[in-house]
Swiss-Prot record:
One of the components of the core complex of photosystem II (PSII). It binds chlorophyll and helps catalyze the primary light-induced photochemical processes of PSII. PSII is a light-driven water:plastoquinone oxidoreductase, using light energy to abstract electrons from H(2)O, generating O(2) and a proton gradient subsequently used for ATP formation. It is found in: Plastid, Chloroplast thylakoid membrane. This is Photosystem II CP47 reaction center protein. The keyword Protease does not apply. One of its GO terms (molecular function) is electron transporter, transferring electrons within the cyclic electron transport pathway of photosynthesis activity. Its main location: plastid. GO terms for cellular component: chloroplast thylakoid membrane; photosystem II. Belongs to the PsbB/PsbC family. PsbB subfamily. The chain crosses the membrane at residues 21-36, 101-115, 140-156, 203-218, 237-252, 457-472. InterPro entries: PS_antenna-like, PS_II_antenna-like_sf, PSII_PsbB. The gene is psbB. PSII is composed of 1 copy each of membrane proteins PsbA, PsbB, PsbC, PsbD, PsbE, PsbF, PsbH, PsbI, PsbJ, PsbK, PsbL, PsbM, PsbT, PsbX, PsbY, PsbZ, Psb30/Ycf12, at least 3 peripheral proteins of the oxygen-evolving complex and a large number of cofactors. It forms dimeric complexes. Gene3D superfamilies: Photosystem II CP47 reaction center protein.
Amino acid sequence: MGLPWYRVHTVVLNDPGRLISVHIMHTALVAGWAGSMTLYELAVFDPSDPVLDPMWRQGMFVIPFMTRLGIKDSWSGWNITGETVINPGIWSYEGVAVAHIVFSGLCFLAAIWHWVYWDLDIFCDERTGKRCLDLPKVFGIHLFLSGVACFGFGAFHVTGLYGPGIWVSDPYGLTGKIQPVDPAWGAEGFDPFVPGGIASHHIAAGILGILAGLFHLSVRPPQRLYVGLRMGNIETVLSSSIAAVFFAAFIVAGTMWYGSATTPVELFGPTRYQWDQGYFQQEIDRRVRAGLAENLSLSEAWSKIPEKLAFYDYIGNNPAKGGLFRAGAMDNGDGIAVGWLGHPIFKDKEGNELFVRRMPTFFETFPVVLVDKEGIVKADVPFRRAESKYSVEQVGVTVEFYGGGLDRVSFGDPAIVKKYARRAQLGEIFELDRATLKSDGVFRSSPRGWFTFGHATFALLFFSGHIWHGARTLFRDVFAGIDSDLDDRIEFGAFQKLGDPTTKRQVV
């Protein structure tokens, strides 16, 4: 046929059988990738430390999505919370992966069958004997079936009526677990951080989809609308389908990057805004103050801070810190976190507490500055020692740790104090193992960053595709070169290929 590579899809025009075939093959590829990628991730995933080396630090991509839907067990005898599992069954990581691979194989065979047996009677119009698809009816069928699936997910799976529920956690990502969720039908259901909205919105959208599907199955579009929206053209279907996909991609890119109940911190890592706003730092400070109010010592108050919460308050877990084009997991960058060293409290020689100014997200280097409680600079690590006025040595800064591995250990050596001041720029201080993975010390992004980048990029591409194909189908006659002064009223290209010379033209 001599088609260029970017027009090979022309072969499925006016060929419903092979159009179905290529769609089934696409489903086979998607399901096969999902199953295969899951098995690969399971082969390299280390579940031994869910607190300091969670899935998102290891660069897992599909495992977090499976976990948020209620899968937590592995055939290898572990589950995502670190417990031992005896008989995980089919509802496990490997079970679902194998099911996807088997489904992929069946779709592959079905695609071949439909490619070979493409000219089926069901695709022929009884009136004309030509191949065609009743696209409004196909739309109604798809809408109805997707509505049933949407309603079923919200009403049964999420609520736990017939299913495990979904991953639900507290606002600070500490107590997450899989549990049933009651639908939230009030205004709180529109809060993106309320899990109940997931159930209620799927139920509502499912009911709407079912009703809309039944409507489109039972009511035919008026001729003026059918012609005006080019409902008989398969490229119209392509354009509107691309619109649905790019719209969904933009939505999920937003919920992933800004955070929501569908993207828990425990599964995808913190958002950049939680670092920018000092979200976890404020919660840690609140807990310490509460401990001191209960007459606990500083050491006791800081020792009660969960290591998980302290780890979130570390810039290395900020997805915007890694750069989009540094390949690999977070562990390949700054290393595998081994333990929390504790919270450093800096003081000058008069005993006044000093606070290290934290590094903003988009800085690779940042001056080490220590300020007092009023925000006034009291000490620093100078760039030029000859002009220094506030150096650690001159001010006599010391550091003492509370909580963690260095609890109640203090240092007065300026070199050591400066080392910990530099590390305090990055949030809470952790011991990091760079030897095991030969980590290079350069921050990486989390799966949250990769997902957002990928979906936002493809959403823009698909938006362009929607405009392109929408314009082609709406202005098909113009692009095909049909004169506006045709004598006969014809719908060009309804059954003929583009540029059919037999179409009658008569200049008035």
